Structure formats: structure tokens, C-alpha cells
């Protein structure tokens, strides 16, 4: 859980999108975030849930997974474990640098660049598609803490509050919610 202050410097390392329901997303020079929708022309953009597994359960539920963010730190950890995974390959729209996304509380707002603002809704739930993408990778993005509780390391999900264009190199400003903080849970 979050303990401390927001980072002094965080940046967007990469941006990606895909119009198809594919596991990986294609790197872009910039992506346009649309308020209440997600990434323009991305398969997961929409007011209601767009992830196929969620649509099968209830297609009318709100889309709390409009945008997927992963820290570049995960990519480096994967390299140390023998997995070279390019930005966007795990399905993330935004790769960040310099902010521990998993330690932030639910409701944290991230200003991406000059205009766009997203609000963290929860943790990405790593699924079998990660293992299908690369054998052994699922075990790298799941772990256990000291108490034995499951730890998800495959990024966080967010909704878009304010639209705008986001590019690699854009600064990220972190705005914490009013305490008490709530731990990010699977969405």
C-alpha cells in the first residue's frame, strides 16, 4: 500500500494501441485519450466494458479498464529473468518510468503530458494469455507477499477523466486521493 509521497519525476516511456482485440499493442508516436472512453481507435475503448471475457459476463458494466499502464521497471525485471518483452507487448497503452504504479492507491490521478488525466481503478488481473504469449511469463507477473497473498505485477487499469494526446517523453504528475487510501484491487 502507498506510504510516502508522490514521485518527483515520472515520464511516459512509450505509448501503444491496437484497433483489434489482440494481446499485444503496437507502439505509436502518440495516442489520443478520450474522456470517459479510453484510447481513440483502441479495441478496449468504450463507456461499457470492452474486454471480451467481461463482455460475456455482463456487457452493460462500466468500463473501468479504459487504459492499461505498466511501469518500465517491470520490463527491466523481466529482462533479468530472461524475458525480453518490448513496450506494448503485454497489452499496455502507456509505459511509465519513475512511478511505482502498484503502490499507488485507488483513485490516484495521473496527468499524462499537458492535458490528459486518468484515474486508477485497479490492478490488471494477469491471465493465461500472458502464458500463451511467452511460456513461463505468467509466473513472472504473479507472486506472493510475506503473508502468502497473491501479488499482481502486470500493471494497473484506469479511466480517462480528461482527454488529450499523450506521447513518449511526456511528464507524469501524480495526484493522490484524499485519505484514507484504498489499496488497488483486481478489476
Task: Name each model feature, range by range.
Residues 1-187:
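Metal-cofactor-dependent catalytic cores
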